[in-house]
Regions:
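Short, internal strand/loop/helix patches
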Residues: 90-137
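Hydrophobic beta-strand positions
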Residues: 17-21, 125, 142-143
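Thiol-/selenol-based redox modules, centered on thioredoxin-like
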Residues: 127-173
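Short active-site neighborhood of thiol/selenol oxidoreductases, capturing the structured segment around
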Residues: 28-57
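Conserved helix-turn-beta segment immediately C-terminal to the redox Cys motif
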Residues: 35-36, 52-76, 94
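Thiol-based oxidoreductase modules, predominantly thioredoxin-like and allied folds used
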Residues: 69-84, 100-110
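N-terminal "domain-start" segment that seeds a small globular fold
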Residues: 1-30
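Extracytoplasmic
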Residues: 11-13, 33-36, 69-72, 84, ...
Length: 173
């Protein structure tokens, strides 16, 4: 019934504990238990897929009822923790809405958590012109509230209309 790809078997939510945007410890499993949770791995200085994906999810959430919005959490896990401090990550995510929070911390833990969901994350690369890029998968893993497992994955190119259609289905699963 989803516009995303259904996972069979579903993925278990990673046991990832990093620093949240409020500067306090944020445990992904504990903080999002029983909520529809969309998890994305990326970085705030990303020139393309990260801001557009967050923007599409934000636009889709704005079209939802309060009941759906209240049950959805979007967690952005940075793949560039050296530059994406909790404070800067929080400021960037605030532009997308109150449903968005971020996690920053040990890159090796981030890479392990991403890999457990079939998402690749590479170490950031510094280029001769001073820019830094972080190669990462562009998938959004959707965890359902009933069992806190990822049953659906969305790839790059998923539209805000696709998310808007699926969010009510995800929220009541």
């Amino acid at each position: 019934p989803y516009r995303g790809t259904e996972l069979d078997p579903p993925f278990t939510k990673p046991d990832l504990v990093l620093t949240g945007t409020d500067g306090k410890q944020f445990g992904l499993r504990e903080e999002t238990a029983g909520k529809t949770t969309l998890v994305f791995f990326g970085y705030t200085n990303c020139p393309d897929v990260c801001p557009t994906t967050m923007g599409d999810i934000s636009a889709a959430l704005s079209k939802q009822s309060a009941a759906v919005r209240d049950n959805v959490r979007v967690v952005f896990v940075t793949t560039d923790p050296e530059r994406d401090t909790p404070k800067s990550l929080g400021k960037w995510l605030a532009a997308f809405g109150e449903n968005f929070t971020g996690m920053s911390g040990d890159l090796e833990q981030v890479k392990k958590a991403a890999l457990s969901l079939g998402i690749s994350v590479e170490d950031p690369k510094k280029h001769h012109d001073g820019t830094v890029t972080s190669d990462h998968g562009a998938q959004v893993a959707a965890f359902l509230p009933a069992d806190d497992k990822a049953h659906v994955v969305y790839t790059a190119g998923t539209t805000s209309d696709d998310y808007a259609r699926d969010l009510p289905l995800l929220a009541k699963s």
